[in-house]
Design a protein with these regions (language model features):
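A generic structural signal for solvent-exposed, polar alpha-helical segments
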Residues: 40, 49, 81, 89, ...
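Interaction-surface and assembly-scaffold signal
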Residues: 6-24, 117-230
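N-terminal domain-onset segments
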Residues: 1-85, 94-95, 207-209, 218-230
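Aromatic- and glycine-enriched beta-alpha-beta binding-site module
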Residues: 71-145
Length: 230
């Protein structure tokens, strides 16, 4: 994907890029794979009909939506440096396996915005962040017409985790491509209080309230090049 195509990456209205952001974008970004280290607060909620509506039609038609995953992430080490991120992903059961698709993602790094859109067709937009993804702390993100915040309360000791997940995104050339994310780290089980405000549909599917989740103290993951999915 070229830099001229980044605006064609589909997402929810909160992921749209305004003229000022488009004018400030770098022409390129480091290619996949990206090897990253991060800390995060994540939460899981039941998928509503609005979650299916948030997906690109080709991904929506590929399976049954089963859950929504939200996250506030602080990237400590990436090919474009450190940055913060908020995201909403929808899990879809496709041919007996779950895969996630991301209709909403925002960062405070122009280089990450371009890299996400060019390498994985992730609809990254620009946001401002406060706080940290840690137990007892509130991390907030705000963009044009929207705001998301998450406050986590942990219980129990940290648990080592090693996970693999499939990311499926529709690309502007009409192809659904997948990447398999490999990660390992440690997490504390948590309850996460989420607030979502938007002039658009974001709160209809990335729902506010108290959700089951986790605080990830530090994790490393590899996100490889996207390839045409099954």
């Amino acid at each position: 994907m070229t830099s001229m195509d980044v605006r064609a990456v589909p997402g929810v209205p909160e992921s749209e890029l305004d003229a000022a952001t488009l004018a400030a974008l770098p022409d390129s970004a480091p290619p996949a794979p990206w090897d990253c280290a991060c800390s995060a607060v994540v939460w899981v909620a039941r998928a509503t009909p609005a979650a299916a509506d948030a997906l690109h039609p080709d991904i929506r038609a590929s399976g049954r939506t089963v859950a929504v995953v939200g996250a506030m992430v602080r990237y400590l080490d990436t090919p474009v440096g450190s940055y913060d991120e908020v995201l909403g992903a929808v899990a879809v059961l496709h041919r007996g396996r779950a895969r996630g698709s991301v209709p909403f993602m925002a960062v405070d790094s122009l280089a990450s915005l371009v890299g996400g859109r060019m390498n994985w067709s992730l609809p990254k937009s620009l946001a401002e962040f406060t706080g940290a993804p840690a137990a007892g702390s509130t991390m907030s993100a705000s963009g044009a017409g929207w705001r998301v915040s998450a406050t986590a309360r942990t219980g129990g000791p940290a648990v080592p985790v090693k996970l693999a997940g499939r990311l499926a995104q529709w690309w502007p050339d009409g192809i659904v491509r997948e990447s398999v994310l490999q990660s390992k780290g440690s997490m504390h089980p948590a309850l996460v209080r989420v607030e979502v405000e938007s002039t658009g549909p974001l709160a209809d599917w990335l729902r506010p309230g108290l959700h089951v989740g986790a605080v990830i103290e530090r994790a490393k993951f590899l996100l490889p090049e996207a390839t045409e999915g099954a």
